[in-house]
Curated annotation (Swiss-Prot):
Major site of localization recorded for this protein: cytoplasm
UniProt keywords, alphabetically: Cytoplasm, Methyltransferase, rRNA processing, S-adenosyl-L-methionine, Transferase
GO cellular component, one term: cytoplasm
Lineage: Bacteria, Pseudomonadati, Myxococcota, Myxococcia, Myxococcales
Protein name: Ribosomal RNA large subunit methyltransferase H
Highest taxon, organism lineage: Bacteria
Chain's gene name: rlmH
Pfam families in the cross-refs: SPOUT_MTase
Length: 153
């Protein structure tokens, strides 16, 4: 199984990228993992236009048979153990998974319509680059839970 995090924008601040890269490297021991960053839309067209442009770019990165899971504030809130079980089910299906993270204005309706699942990483509103770090860390945590390794206590 391959898991891809497809996210709008780059971490220009440098705050989160090193940690995301570290967890991505660790994930490589368990599964094929890829982080795909797509550019943020210019806000000249307004919020709706920018969301639409980013949405089209995200959808273009998805394979026809990939399971699409979006991060959305109205998505399922899971514990780490429940998320690990979700990952286990994805692995049992043998289907590649694309986890999509929108930009600062959220996801376009077309992206939400394409989603097979919606997940929320927190009830808090998080910067989308911080949400990316939380998601990648939780993927790593899920793999250690499934393997019975001591990372998750």
């Amino acid at each position: 199984m391959k898991v891809r995090v497809v996210a709008v924008g780059r971490d220009r601040s440098g705050l989160y990228a090193p940690a995301v890269e570290e967890y991505a490297k660790r994930l490589g021991r368990y599964l094929r993992f890829e982080l795909v960053e797509v550019p943020e839309a210019r806000k000249l067209a307004g919020t709706a236009g920018a969301k639409g442009e980013e949405g089209a770019t995200l959808l273009a990165k998805i394979g026809p048979r990939e399971r699409v899971v979006v991060l959305d504030e109205r998505g399922d809130e899971l514990t780490s153990v429940a998320f690990a079980e979700r990952v286990r089910r994805w692995m049992e299906r043998g289907q590649d998974v694309a986890l999509l993270i929108g930009g600062s204005d959220g996801l376009a309706p077309e992206v939400l319509a394409r989603a097979d699942e919606r997940l929320a990483v927190s009830r808090f509103t998080l910067a989308h680059r911080l949400a990316r770090l939380v998601l990648v860390e939780q993927l790593y945590r899920a793999m250690t839970i499934l393997r019975g390794e001591p990372y998750h206590k």
